């Protein structure tokens, strides 16, 4: 799998308007909700106006956004925000902004403080979220937010108060007419055309295992571990440096590209270790034209998803976390259903060979359960795709929280519908 001619990676902070090849949405009937329709918002009795809904999936690495009913997001925008210090802003005068998002981060001559508003998938900096959404509405999509309903994804096990924050920001700052916020895991399962299953999601900053039955998260059973794709990238950089290369945090966008183009999960890592360099190596051309050779690092980096102790983490590996969750489903009566529908989601699961390795490890841990692992080709955007399906269904329209409802009932309106 030579990558010598692979395109140079784009710097972090790129607003990527080309989401790639379009897929197809599962039939709404398959998702367990019958009929499709436009978003309809009741503003006054006997008066209904149609509104085009937006779907926003705010991830630790990228914010995916686009219109409901589309097969894939329109934009992938970096979740990193560049901030000028007060001193830098004062020196720059009125000609420079204080905050930079998306393509604005490219080719910046002045150094910026880079801020990621999410920690392990959960929002910790709401000012940056506002900056990102302003960029989405006004720069990327060039829309008036007060003319669109917005569906927002929320990670499992995040504070319930975050849903209130989403509502306050969207209604009070952007003046949107309606919103809904729902679990990322629930949206992911809809992307598979299912309403029941065990969602195993690993993105950039966090991984979850969430059992869902008929559209409901089974209470007390979702599990989370605080490692994911960014940890794999950092581990790959460590392995490459141990092999004699000299990468630093400034080169993480290059390491990320190497991970996507060169790395894989070995089905039998012990056998892979015995292979010679001539059987394993690939050449990779760096942006400056230098060519490096990558060997065992190609598959060794992914081992941390199965043995997190390799990166100093005491939490269980993804197969073990999944097996434990399955065992806990025994008392609910849903174990057999969950084992038959183990659904991989998130960008970290896109690593070549990962589904097969995960299936093997899980089968060894649960020999009596005969677990069946599914890996949809478009699972990198499973959360957004599920949101696109959900927000376009006629049966869902009654679950929008309108601005009027929020003004009248406050946060109670959110919890009654979301």
From Swiss-Prot:
InterPro entries: Actin, ATPase_NBD
Protein name (Swiss-Prot/TrEMBL): Actin-like protein 7B
Subcellular location: Cytoplasm, Cytoskeleton
Major site of localization recorded for this protein: cytoplasm
Family stated for the protein in its record: Belongs to the actin family.
Statement: the UniProt record of this protein carries the keyword Lipid metabolism: no
Entry superkingdom: Eukaryota
Keywords, alphabetical: Cytoplasm, Cytoskeleton, Phosphoprotein
Modified residues (Phosphoserine): 8
GO CC terms of this entry: cytoplasm; cytoskeleton
CDD domains listed in its UniProt record: ASKHA_NBD_ACTL7
Tissue: Testis specific.
Gene that specifies this protein: Actl7b
Segments of this protein annotated with the region Disordered: 1-42
């Amino acid at each position: 799998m030579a990558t010598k001619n692979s395109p140079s990676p784009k710097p972090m902070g790129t607003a990527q308007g080309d989401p790639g090849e379009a897929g197809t949405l599962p039939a709404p009937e398959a998702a367990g909700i019958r009929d499709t329709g436009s978003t309809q918002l009741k503003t006054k009795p006997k008066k209904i106006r149609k509104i085009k809904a937006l779907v926003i999936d705010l991830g630790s690495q990228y914010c995916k956004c686009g219109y409901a009913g589309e097969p894939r997001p329109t934009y992938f925008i970096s979740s990193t925000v560049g901030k000028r210090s007060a001193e830098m802003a004062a020196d720059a005068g009125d000609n420079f902004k204080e905050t930079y998002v998306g393509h604005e981060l490219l080719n910046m001559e002045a150094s910026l403080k880079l801020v990621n508003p999410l920690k392990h998938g959960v929002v910790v900096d709401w000012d940056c979220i506002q900056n990102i959404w302003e960029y989405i509405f006004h720069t990327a999509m060039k829309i008036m937010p007060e003319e669109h309903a917005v569906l927002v994804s929320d990670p499992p096990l995040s504070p319930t108060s975050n849903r209130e924050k989403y509502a306050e920001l969207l209604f009070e700052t952007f003046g949107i007419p309606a919103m809904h916020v729902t679990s990322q895991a629930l949206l992911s399962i809809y992307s598979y055309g299912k309403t029941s299953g065990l969602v195993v999601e690993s993105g950039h900053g966090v991984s979850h295992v969430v059992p869902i039955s008929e559209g409901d998260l089974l209470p007390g059973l979702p599990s989370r571990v605080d490692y994911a794709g960014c940890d794999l990238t950092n581990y790959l950089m460590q392995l490459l440096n141990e092999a004699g290369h000299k990468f630093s945090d400034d080169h993480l966008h290059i390491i990320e590209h190497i991970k996507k183009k060169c790395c894989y999960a070995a089905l039998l890592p012990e056998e892979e270790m015995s292979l010679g360099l001539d059987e394993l190596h690939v050449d990779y051309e760096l942006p400056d034209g230098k060519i490096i050779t990558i060997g065992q690092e190609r598959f060794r980096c992914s081992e941390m998803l199965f043995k997190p102790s390799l990166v100093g983490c005491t939490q269980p590996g993804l197969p073990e976390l999944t097996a434990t969750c399955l065992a806990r489903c025994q008392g609910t009566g849903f174990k057999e259903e969950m084992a038959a529908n183990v659904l991989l989601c998130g960008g970290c699961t896109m690593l070549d060979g990962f589904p097969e390795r995960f299936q093997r490890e899980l089968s060894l841990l649960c020999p009596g359960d005969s677990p069946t692992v599914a890996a949809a080709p478009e699972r990198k955007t499973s959360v957004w795709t599920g949101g696109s399906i959900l927000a376009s269904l006629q049966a869902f329209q009654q679950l929008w929280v309108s601005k009027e409802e929020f003004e009248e009932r406050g946060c109670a309106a959110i919890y009654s519908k979301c």
